[in-house]
From Swiss-Prot:
GO molecular function, one term: metal ion binding
Signal peptide positions (record): none
Protein known as: Catalase-peroxidase
The protein's required cofactors: heme b
Organism (species): Rhizobium meliloti (strain 1021) (Ensifer meliloti)
Pfam family of the protein (one): peroxidase
The EC number(s) this enzyme carries: 1.11.1.21
Enzyme kind, highest EC tier: oxidoreductase
Length: 727
């Protein structure tokens, strides 16, 4: 009674601590499917009808850039501009917005404006970037929804560079804001700057691309604060590579970014207050309040080092390399106690940020010296020292790549400053250069495909393999381009290379015959034909299950060439596991349980939990994956709800198969006769209470037609995931 009366009349939603234990607290190993339901319209104040691309077209970009240029030198007392110019601050803001990108899973990056939210807004490496965004607020307020925060952060970095005399490579809008934090795996650590992500001989766990929790890349003082430039170079090379940058791009980015501005280590970090998320309500989201002196300007503390790189920190120059090679360096410490380096026996040539009468000797970060003392970096750095124009071009291109890497193909780019040049990292797909097939052609092609002798399983598997590489994170992959016929995808184990080659050979023959027979310039690409063939197979399977349905198909895909494909970059898209195909690699290290990998892939495919559920059930009965397990039907290649019916049959008792990790045997509960074998991914739909609820819907007697319709809708969503031209 006491317990009941204590809670009577209280709101059931916990708003403040202390709070009751959540399900995850009670069952920490429970599979989290809520990641599939984030960023819904329920959290979007602009509503489902808002079209950012249309709003961006109304933007007066020239006027916006004029306002941004004016802001650069409009120093505010509450956060004064170093050297009278905010350029360095805004370059860091843009860099750190984009720099969370990681090629392994395509997550992070500037594409959603996540720097506004926790945890990124409170990472130690993002200290005082809250001030940069507050400086931008009057401009964002003025231009409203015509410029997203995500675009504004990057555009401001570009304008900062241009205002200081640098010619940028271009700018593309098109980043759409989200309205809640992205709950990503940023590392296993429970403390800022922890480094539990390493194992063995400094092996950085995937998919992580930073050396410590709360850093963008590396520790500027050196690995774990050890001021060793050569050891730091190893960290730099690995973290930048995981952001898809090669050595030349890495050197250009570090040197180019460190041509401007300064770091801030005026005093002991103990003077710094709470980060934005941990601050008092009256702080209004401004964090890192410092009680050292004035706390701002000459007294600012952002990190540890106190370094200015150039004699002209508000103008583009080659001073970074000139100073790097023209001096010898000795280890010292900043006023904050951080390791840094100063030029030996050097004149004081570096201006003070706030006192024009003062000069300082040149200083460097440990990671700056890596560009001189690592042999590969040193060779590139000397070339840039001797060829300033080459350095400027390399930095312009690397900066554009840094800030646009997660935007996907150029068809998503908006605005008048989009560069005309195609870049291989954009995963170029040729423009449509022929008439597209019509409904009559489509019907004829379907008939030829079905009559070709290829099975439902072969056609569905090939279409799924082609389309399911899509990543909603960085908009890479997908069926457009037909890169499944090229290295490395054609050789991936998950794609069953021998079967894939046979299917593609037949489809290419159908394509050749059709295209050769046309007299009006009409053609079909292999990319389109692969998707059409998968749809035709699904229709055949539905008919075998007693349902007539048409799988939607929109032509317009094109075939990319080998020259347009960076094979090494596409290697990152190879799945270690694909629960939709019941595949787990036995030769590559696994970082997740198979069912977790399924949810992870579903999230990359932008699927909801019900969509994931219906796709797994359909793909199993169509035998689209591992043929031995999970095919819970006596009618394979017929699109039925048998997977769910048989999984939930209480007449079946499941037990692990000895010697086969993650594989289970289902036997008749009464007779002990073997019925099925399944994997963890199969059984999770009966074990996990929420997924079981979805499975029950599709196992119902009245759900057969709904199952087919829902499968076709989810299938079509995946097939069209990369069709940005249809949006």
């Amino acid at each position: 009674m006491d317990q009941k009366s204590d809670s009577a009349g209280k709101c059931p939603v916990a708003h403040t601590a202390p709070r009751g234990r959540s399900n995850r607290d009670w069952w920490p190993d429970q599979l989290d499917v809520q990641v599939l339901h984030r960023h819904s319209g329920l959290s979007d104040p602009l509503g489902n009808t808002f079209n950012y691309a249309e709003e961006f077209k109304k933007l007066d970009l020239d006027a916006l850039k004029r306002d941004l240029r004016a802001l650069m030198t409009d120093s505010q007392d509450w956060w004064p501009a170093d050297f009278g110019h905010y350029g360095g601050l805004f370059i860091r803001m843009a860099w750190h917005s984009a720099g969370t990108y990681r090629i392994t899973d395509g997550r992070g990056g500037a594409g959603q404006g996540q720097q506004r939210f926790a945890p990124l807004n409170s990472w130690p490496d993002n200290a005082n970037l809250d001030k940069a965004r507050r400086l931008l607020w009057p401009i964002k307020q003025k231009y409203g929804n015509r410029i997203s925060w995500a675009d504004l952060l990057i555009l401001t970095g570009n304008v900062a560079l241009e205002s200081m005399g640098f010619k940028t490579f271009g700018f593309a809008g098109g980043r759409v804001d989200v309205w809640e934090p992205e709950e990503l795996f940023w590392g296993p650590e429970g403390t800022w700057l922890g480094d539990e992500r390493y194992s063995g001989e400094r092996q950085l766990s995937e998919p992580l691309a930073a050396v410590q929790m709360g850093l963008i890349y590396v520790n500027p003082e050196g690995p774990n604060g050890n001021p060793d430039p050569v050891a730091a170079a190893r960290d730099i090379r690995e973290t930048f590579a995981r952001m898809a940058m090669n050595d030349e791009e890495t050197v250009a980015l570090i040197a180019g970014g460190h041509t401007f501005g300064k770091t801030h280590g005026a005093g002991d970090p103990s003077f710094i207050g709470a980060d934005p998320e941990g601050g008092a309500i009256e702080d209004q989201g401004l964090g890192w309040k410092s009680t050292f002196g004035t706390g701002v300007g000459k007294d600012a503390i952002t990190g540890g080092p106190e370094v200015t790189w150039s004699q002209t920190p508000t103008r583009w120059s080659n001073h970074f390399f000139e100073n790097l090679f023209n001096h010898e360096w000795e280890l010292t410490k900043s006023p904050a106690g951080a390791y840094q380096w100063k030029a030996k026996n050097a004149e004081a040539t570096i201006p003070d940020a706030y006192d024009p009468s003062r000069k300082h000797v040149p200083t460097r970060l440990t990671t700056d010296l890596s560009l001189r003392f690592d042999p590969a970096y040193e060779k590139i750095s000397r070339r840039f020292l001797e060829n300033p124009d080459e350095f400027a071009d390399a930095f312009a291109r690397a900066w554009f790549k840094l800030t646009h890497r997660d935007m996907g193909p150029k068809v998503r780019y908006l605005g008048p400053e989009v560069p005309a040049e195609d870049l291989i990292w954009q995963d170029v797909i040729p423009a449509v250069d022929h008439r597209l097939v019509d409904e009559t052609d489509i019907a004829g092609l379907k008939a030829k495909i079905i009559a070709s002798g290829l099975s439902v399983q072969e056609l569905v598997s090939t279409a799924w393999a082609s389309a399911s590489t899509f990543r909603g994170s960085d908009k890479r992959g997908g069926a457009n381009g037909a890169r499944i016929r090229l290295a490395p995808q054609k050789d991936w184990e998950v794609n069953r290379p021998a079967q894939l080659a046979r299917v593609l050979s037949v489809l290419e023959g159908i394509q050749r015959d059709f295209n050769a027979a046309q007299t009006d310039g009409k053609k079909i690409s292999l990319a389109d034909l692969i998707v059409l063939a998968g749809g035709a197979a699904v229709e055949k399977a539905a008919k075998a299950g007693g349902h007539d349905i048409t799988v939607p198909f929109t032509p317009g895909r094109m075939d990319a060439s080998e020259a347009q494909t960076d094979a090494a970059s596409f290697a990152a898209l190879e799945p270690r596991a694909d629960g939709f195909r019941n595949y787990v690699s036995t030769t590559r290290q696994q970082f997740m349980k198979p069912e977790e990998a399924l949810v992870d892939r579903a999230q990359l495919l932008t699927l909801t939990a019900p969509e994931m559920t219906v796709l797994v059930g359909g793909l199993r009965v169509l035998k689209a994956g591992e043929p031995k397990h999970g095919v819970f039907t006596s009618r394979p290649e017929a699109l039925t709800n048998d997977f769910f019916v048989n999984l939930l049959d209480m007449g079946t008792q499941w037990s692990p198969i000895e010697g086969e990790e993650g594989v289970y045997e289902g036997r008749d509960r009464r007779t002990g006769a073997a019925r099925w074998t399944g994997t963890r991914v199969d059984l999770i739909f009966g074990s996990h209470s929420q997924l079981r609820a979805f499975a029950e819907v599709y196992a119902q007697s009245d759900a057969r037609e709904k199952f087919v319709k829902d499968f076709v809708a989810a299938w079509t969503k995946v097939m069209n995931a990369d069709r940005f031209d249809l949006v």
